[in-house]
Amino acid sequence: GGMRQRVVISLALAAQPKLIIADEPTTALDVSIQAQIIQLLKKLGREHGTAVMLVTHDMGVIAETADRVAVMYAGRIAEIGPVAEVIHHPQHPYTIGLMGAIPSVGDYNERLAQIEGSMPRLTAIPAGCAFNPRCTRVNDVPGQRCTTERPGLLPAGKTRAACWLHATDNAAAHTKVPA
């Protein structure tokens, strides 16, 4: 198990890249092989001075390997920041719902939380915040901003969130993603 991933990683490093983008590198692998592949990516990244960007839905992998995380919704960054902050103190309503949907270890009687509604088609993203049709906080923002204006990434605690709940004034609407 994991031999294909190892071969692809080796081929990628042969070109001496500054960045490796690993899209779901551990999907369909058992936990022990998954850990080996992640450790290999980290080790080779350090040895070769190569940055590794993981694209994954597995928050466990993110928690174990990444320094920073960008949570995306409908093709846009909803929240970005240090992994521990985003996981333990999420600021965007989508990130809050996402973290709440992760089952607790050992609590078999707990009902899994879910985010009501469904993702929009990427060809039909709603005006304003793409999450607004599903957001439980949409009415907490004055002036219908969530449904009319797309928010930029706004300071939100130790992260940045694309959410009008964190706007201090109207001028904060269009900030850029930090490097």
Regions found by a protein language model. Give the residues of each.
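Short amphipathic alpha-helical "recognition" segments used for binding
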Residues: 9, 38-40, 147
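P-loop NTP-binding/switch modules centered on Walker-like glycine-rich loops
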Residues: 16-17, 21-25, 29-111
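Short catalytic/signature loops enriched in Gly
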Residues: 80-179
